[in-house]
Regions:
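Long, low-complexity N-terminal extensions
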Residues: 1-272
């Protein structure tokens, strides 16, 4: 086994990168090539960047459900129809991304590396609230890029083994962290998703009830917001659903999501 010995002695991966390998940071690599990303964005006008929306999270009995649509838009065009927006960051936490797709995905993956690195160094996982704080720091560090349009506004959720409940947080563009006690949605269709959840959510909802609420909220958002992708039966594209409980993270298969969708459609037609 090779042990790394350097100047940095903490447990943060990004801080270690800054101290030991600053040349590997993307902004420093661009600077070495003589590229100023902010100046390039200003000089070139608005960047054409894929954006991903809408995502949501809601508490249920014994945990939390996290969901996201699959559409990414680039202005008035479709950038991707099957973008993954919900990522596991460790065995008991999830991030749902909204904003500029590239920076969002990079931050989700970097957070996973951060948490893995912390657990290897400290010998135990970071507490759930500490994970939420770490994400807030990363979003705050992204503020200069956000001022150029590369906004990252995720939802973070997971199971807290100390409190034995599911918890979830929303964030603002400056890294402000706000815990929600029931449900939350972010992205272009978040207003409509929240309105849907306001009508359907109830304390103590079962896992299956919460999954139905999540799919229904995304369907309502897609019905009103052009940036939110609905169910694409022809292509077999359905929202991403994950459940986090004391047993870990369960990714819901698309066949189950399809059944939930059919049940909602039949119910609205008056047949269910």
């Amino acid at each position: 086994m090779v042990l790394f010995r350097g100047k940095y002695q903490g447990s943060s991966f990004t801080e270690m990168l800054d101290v030991e390998f600053p040349h590997l940071r993307i902004e420093n690599r661009l600077a070495a090539l003589g590229v100023n990303a902010a100046a390039a964005a200003t000089a070139g006008g608005a960047l054409s960047i894929p954006h991903g929306t809408t995502v949501l999270a809601l508490k249920c009995e014994g945990g939390v459900v996290v969901a996201g649509d699959r559409l990414a838009t680039e202005g008035y065009r479709v950038a991707s129809r099957d973008l993954q927006k919900v990522y596991a960051t460790d065995a008991h936490s999830l991030i749902a991304i909204a904003g500029a797709a590239g920076p969002c995905i990079e931050m989700a993956k970097l957070l996973r590396v951060e948490l893995e690195h912390y657990e290897k160094i400290e010998g135990e996982p970071l507490e759930l609230e500490g994970k939420a704080n770490k994400l807030a720091q990363m979003i705050r560090a992204n503020l200069p890029a956000a001022m150029q349009g590369l906004v990252v506004v995720p939802i973070f959720a997971g199971y807290d083994p100390r409190r034995r409940v599911g918890r979830l947080w929303k964030y603002d563009v400056a890294g402000g962290r706000y815990e929600e006690t029931e449900y939350e949605s972010t992205g272009s269709g978040s207003l409509y998703a929240r309105e849907s959840l306001k009508k359907s959510w109830r304390p103590g909802a079962t896992r299956d009830e919460a999954l139905r609420m999540a799919v229904q909220a995304l369907m309502d958002a897609a019905d009103e917001d052009r940036g939110t992708g609905g169910v694409d039966v022809q292509r077999g594209i359905y929202p991403t659903l994950s459940v986090c409980t004391v047993d870990g993270i369960e990714e819901i298969p698309h066949t189950t999501t399809a059944e939930i969708h059919r049940g909602i459609v039949e119910s609205r037609r008056g047949n269910g």
